[in-house]
Amino acid sequence: MPWYPWLKATVFALLAANAAVYAATGTASEALDSTAWLALLAAFEFETGFAGRFAGGRLAAVLRCVRLVAAAAILAAGIGYVLDGEWLDAANIGLWIVVVALLEFEVRYPAATARHRSQFKAAVATLYSGLAALVFAWLWQRDWFDAYDAALWLVAFATIELNLVGFGRGAVAGRGAG
């Protein structure tokens, strides 16, 4: 699909703009949260969106370091949300952490994921449903920017899921479409 790379680039640019807004006008937890997730998204995109070209070597080690630092920052932001009583944000981070853990498992162990595909799909559907419910909770609270940002993140991670099944430029090394 010729439009797919443009969709991913547009979503990434919008998320980068959101991170800038949170850095300029939000809390420290919001700034840390948005920039760390953006770094994690970029690392996942490199791993899943380029047909395994970055699966080995120096760049693979850099991507692992980026993921580790981003994960630590996300955990710190989550603690900040709990300490600030921002329960929707804390729940959002918790759900996304589990989504990322499942994505990591899917990238690292595709054969195991394939063997347990129905359970994996059910878990992912439950998590994404919870994340969608948070979008509606923010809308109900008239917190338009957080709702928009959360919806945009759902689109961003949907593109990673599409990468994993081979949509667009290619699948992860060792994975076929399907």
Regions found by a protein language model. Name each.
Residues 1-178:
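Polytopic alpha-helical membrane-helix bundles and their juxtamembrane interface segments
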